[in-house]
Design a protein with these regions (language model features):
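Residue-level recognition of single "structural anchor" positions
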Residues: 1-295
Length: 295
């Protein structure tokens, strides 16, 4: 018989991973080895990646917002030259798209912040949408060519450009961690005929906050950052399945975004994710015949 944790314990660990707990704190609280927690994260990440990719398609969204959120892996970019770093160490950006009506995360992508990653992100988004949408992004320049490559003229695309002043508190210690003050915005139509009243990135930015609160490795000014790029992606895959399919949203009347978007008929839970893990697990390679024990 396989030596593995029961379903309830595994579901609890997965819930803790998307409720702001670090992996070592989960190990301490549950009394489970850190290696077991790590393996469970890897298995869950792989299962959730396949499930999300196969399920979140044919979307009938009308308004979509996109944004990028910063994190880092192994070391910050400014320390990259001073450390013997593995591949993908340094700044890591997570690109996300969210349906403004159902709050569903349509797709996500992890990598750099340049034109190559913007293009791959937008091509994937276009492949998941079933109709023409109004798309809003921030003023990041790579979006311009990426949207054109992915959608052509079959989209109503606008950018919301924020204007910033100086950080409160000046350049001293008081203003070191304070964001610059937003002094205004400009709405710029790029493709098609976007409705200016609906040009917004508020839901995408609010979802960024949810990510920072839900995943410990996204919390600023801690040592809980990702040490390995693969595990960074695994926890994101788990988080987005939880956010879309398992989490009750008060703004939606207590149902999940997937239910609101019409791609799920019920509210799922982490035991469902455990079931995905077990389904994806390879069958034990037991011998078909056994030698008789010598007398």
């Amino acid at each position: 018989m396989a030596n593995k944790l029961d379903t309830t314990t595994r579901a609890m660990i997965l819930n803790l991973l998307v409720e702001g707990s670090s992996m070592r704190s989960i190990s301490r609280v549950t009394g489970v080895s850190i290696n077991t927690v790590t393996k469970l994260l890897v298995d869950a990440g792989n299962a959730c990646l396949d499930f999300h990719d196969a399920t979140v398609r044919g979307l009938k969204s009308k308004r979509v917002e996109c944004d990028e959120i910063w994190s880092f892996c192994y070391a910050k970019e400014k320390n990259a030259d001073d450390a013997k770093m593995p591949t993908f160490a340094g700044d890591v950006w997570t690109w996300t798209s969210i349906c403004a009506d159902s709050k569903l995360i349509c797709n996500w992508f992890v990598g750099g912040r340049d034109a190559e990653f913007a293009n791959r992100f937008m091509l994937d988004l276009a492949d998941r949408l079933d109709n023409r949408v109004q798309l809003t992004t921030d003023g990041h320049k790579p979006y311009l060519q990426a949207v054109e490559n992915a959608f052509g003229n079959e989209i109503d695309f606008a950018q919301l450009v924020k204007l910033y002043g100086s950080a409160p508190g000046g350049k001293g210690a008081q203003g070191k961690y304070s964001p610059a003050e937003c002094t205004g915005i400009k709405k710029k139509a790029r493709v098609g005929n976007p409705d200016e009243a609906k040009v917004s990135t508020s839901y995408a930015e609010r979802q960024n906050l949810t990510m920072r609160m839900s995943m410990r490795r996204f919390t600023r000014l801690t040592n809980a950052f990702s040490k390995k790029f693969d595990n960074h992606c695994h926890v994101l895959a788990l988080y987005f399945v939880h956010y879309n399919f398992c989490r009750q949203h008060k703004s939606l009347g207590g149902i999940s975004p997937a239910m609101e978007a019409g791609i799920s008929n019920e509210l799922l839970d982490m035991k469902f994710v455990v079931g995905l893990i077990d389904t994806n697990a390879p069958k034990p390679n037991r011998p078909k015949t056994y030698k008789k024990r010598a007398k």
